[in-house]
């Protein structure tokens, strides 16, 4: 399902750029300054199925993304009682073959991270970092994600997720 236009190769570095260019902020205004993050989001967002065009911006949207929705369903089922889900369990189930319900997802670690952070941006989940991340103990969620500058180290310390609690 995931196909990129032209001869672009989706690398771990581009994944970090996509997160900082679109997922972190939730939108790219039409007149946004072109930098490596915005370019990566524009180049890879459509293939990752995380982007929707509006008249004045490109907007993060994973509502129609089967991978993000299947990840959310997995979190909802396993964490229904408020129990956190280890990010490693998500990697185990969505990277490679033999995932939930016999599906072969074949996602990369960075793709799983993009979808998790997109779900956090949309207010569906919160993500806790491991103790050695060097960042705040506060979870990453819709209220804090835009203030986080993501890099490879941060992404590698995604530790566990919780379903969002809404008032």
Descriptions of predicted regions:
Residues 1-167:
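Extended alpha-helical interface modules used as scaffolds for assembling large macromolecular complexes
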